[in-house]
Amino acid sequence: MNELTYLQTMPKQTALLKTHCADFVVKEQLGYEMSGDGEFVAVKVRKTDCNTLFVAEKLAHFAGIPAKNMGYAGLKDRKAITEQWFCLQMPGQPTPDFNQFQLDGVEILEVTRHNRKIRTGSLDGNHFEILLREAQENADLKVRLENIKKNGFPNYFTEQRFGRDGHNLTQALRWAKGEINVKDRKKRSFYLSAARSEIFNLIVSARIRQGLHHKILVNDILQLSGSHSWFHADQKEDFNLLQQRLAQQDIQITAPLIGENVQIASDVENEIIAKHQELLYLMHQEKMKSARRPILMQAQHLSWSFIPEGLKLTFYLPAGSYATALVRELVNINE
């Protein structure tokens, strides 16, 4: 990610992230309450240094059901303390006694029932509590924090999306060139996600570099904030009014997650995608649906304090946005 453009400038400080699991706390918010009855057993878990898939498998084994009958809203960081819901499909069966469930690093917080499966993506967002160790209080860092609070940060996909050392992206490029054949369903999904995340990042970086991240262009596709509704900024629109709405954070400029029937909105998008036709072809071949994503993201309820250990941050992000993309604007990280 080093080559991606910063919204501010490259940070001047270096800090430590995830020295301890307690330095990175994530609390999931589904956006709905459990129904209290139904064929699914819903289990809220606090995990410390645990992989989501590993915990899901252990819960399924304890309940005596296949792992495929487990559901969760999303994968969480391993080296962290995370809270999230799992659901187990158990129609007509009693709720297991999870007081008997034992797994290092896992604490059962709540058990109830629900009438629908918790699916990947059925997530409103996440609350974060992050400690950046060795970050020093100074004028530059305070300005960066205030700028993020006011203007947001680039909504980049970060390293987690691309796998260790960018492995998922490398494999996607090899797949697109016909060098490998990927049969494993999970790997196919990871590689496709990495490929279109890379295109998105490059488009966002180019707009910021060209000073176009706060300027609405003809044919831009805009998103109503807090929704998944989009509309074109065609020549009939009042661009002065659109710019006012953008400044008021009522609307957001988007960039594409390439796929079938992708709508290329601006010259910036066209230029980047034209250089990666093999990836676009792969998306069509795999029938990936195209989507849009805001190029900038606003951290909600952002607050901070300097303590002897470093800088402590708390904020909320909608599903799909990365806390490490925000941190990237503040400090260089040594993990």
From Swiss-Prot:
The cross-references to InterPro entries, in alphabetical order and at most eight, read: PsdUridine_synth_cat_dom_sf (IPR020103), PsdUridine_synth_TruD (IPR001656), PsdUridine_synth_TruD_CS (IPR020119), PsdUridine_synth_TruD_insert (IPR011760), TruD_catalytic (IPR042214), TruD_insert_sf (IPR043165), TruD_pseudoU_synthase (IPR050170)
- Show where the TRUD domain sits: 152-308
Query: Which top EC class applies here?
Result: isomerase
A GO cellular component annotated for this chain's UniProt record is: cytosol
Which Pfam families does the record match to this protein? TruD
Q: Does the keyword Disulfide bond apply?
A: no
Q: Which domain of life is it from?
A: Bacteria
Q: What residues form the catalytic site here?
A: 77 (nucleophile)
Which residues constitute the signal peptide according to the record? none
Gene Ontology MF term list: RNA binding; tRNA pseudouridine(13) synthase activity
Q: Which HAMAP family match?
A: TruD
This chain's protein is named: tRNA pseudouridine synthase D
Provide the species name.
Histophilus somni (strain 129Pt) (Haemophilus somnus)
From the UniProt record, report the name of the gene that encodes this protein. Answer: truD
